[in-house]
Amino acid sequence: MTIALSEQLTNRFFRYLAVSSQSDAASPTLPSTEGQHKMAQMLAEELRQLGLEDILIDEHATVTARKPGNQPTAPRIGFITHIDTVDVGLSPDIHPQRLRFTGSDLCLNAEQGIYLRTAEHPEILRYQGEEIIFSDGTSVLGADNKAAVTVVMTLLENLTADDCHGDIVVAFVPDEEIGLRGAKALDLARFDVDFAYTIDCCELGEVVYENFNAASAEIDIIGVTAHPMSAKNVLINPIRVAYDIISEFSPQETPEHTEGREGYVWFTDMTANPNSAKLKIAIRDFDNVSFAARKAYIGEVVAKVSAQYPRAKISYSVTDVYSNISNSIGEDKRAIDLIFSSMAELNIEPKVIPMRGGTDGAALSTQGLLTPNYFTGAHNFHSPFEFLPISSFVKSYQLTRTICLSAAKA
């Protein structure tokens, strides 16, 4: 008996979630965690069983493979998904569950008293009566991005010789959540396609071909230590210097006070002791001019505060992380056009959004490979209340399949 598509997707998704593959920003290695090696090995073995060609798993836990097409004139389409889940201080182990939403608050974990409150997450109200996948509230769900891994692998399993399509090339990469490290290291000679897609984040219908420009900055401060009994006119407290630096930035241009296409500067980490302090900063903006100005302002603030504390030593660095996909859109817009035509065929209403984040596609688009993004169907990423309506999960799969088949007809 043929298993229902919803069951096929859910069963595979749960199997992938059973492999703990949280990334670790503090690790200098690629991948940053051993669990990602395990995830990559699992996928490589499944690809072998499915009969794909050119399967390669490298030392960085990047897996690439090709499903040969039967339409030689069709474009080569790529799908890139990431195998890590995010570390936000929750458990690295994910315990998924299927619950039917009846319209009331949902108990995710009775033992720990964890509830999803509809007043706090009103977006769930549109899924009344539906089956939805949640974690048990002790971790993220990991639909970001294992729902996408599931969609792609299920497509590769289900395509038959009767389905007309071009070559489909897949890449499963590590450490997206800690700076797109895997995508940046991907050899595009291995991922040789005409255009590609990520399936990362986003509720049903959402399409992304515009995202933040992103940079990171670090400011290092060395003060002057002294015993408090003789500190007058001697001691330079690096924590106070750090406070003065932070105070130079608008409190309204932060993630919690901005939306849409508004950019921000976000102080993400601070370590300090009586001798030194370090600040870490995330810089985000859609507009290229504003983005450059925000990066330059870091240096202006350091110069200003250095003048106030001439005996302190203050240094800084700014590093670009990824750029706006829209910067890379040229005359060939087939990748984007196929999303919309395929959505129309499936009666899915598109919702184009400027993504206040980035995907592996941002790294690839910067290298000249246009890689727009569309939905998995999930909500509340990076949260214990992340959830994935199964109906939306199915639609994500159907869209992925339709894109591949429609491209061969164009």
From Swiss-Prot:
Cross-referenced Gene3D superfamilies, in alphabetical order?
3.30.70.360, Zn peptidases
UniProt EC number: 3.4.11.-
Top EC class for this record: hydrolase
**Chain sites annotated for binding Zn(2+) 2:** 144, 177, 382
Q: Name one Pfam family in it.
A: Peptidase_M20
- Recite the UniProt keywords alphabetically: Hydrolase, Metal-binding, Metalloprotease, Protease, Zinc
Keyword Signal found:
no
Q: What's an example Gene Ontology biological process for this entry?
A: proteolysis
Q: Which residues form the active site?
A: 84, 176 (proton acceptor)
| Cofactor binding description | Binds 2 Zn(2+) ions per subunit.
Q: State where Zn(2+) 1 binds.
A: 82, 144, 200
Q: What cofactor requirement does the entry state?
A: Zn(2+)
Query: In which domain of life is the source organism classified?
Result: Bacteria
Q: List the Gene Ontology MF annotations in alphabetical order.
A: metallopeptidase activity; tripeptide aminopeptidase activity; zinc ion binding
**Bilayer-spanning residue ranges:** none
User: Which InterPro entries did the record assign?
Assistant: ArgE/DapE_CS, Bact_exopeptidase_dim_dom, Peptidase_M20, Peptidase_M20_dimer, Peptidase_M20B
Concerning its family, UniProt says: Belongs to the peptidase M20B family.
Matching PANTHER family, A to Z? PEPTIDASE T
Give the protein's recorded name: Peptidase T-like protein YPO1009/y3403/YP_3421
Organism of provenance: Yersinia pestis
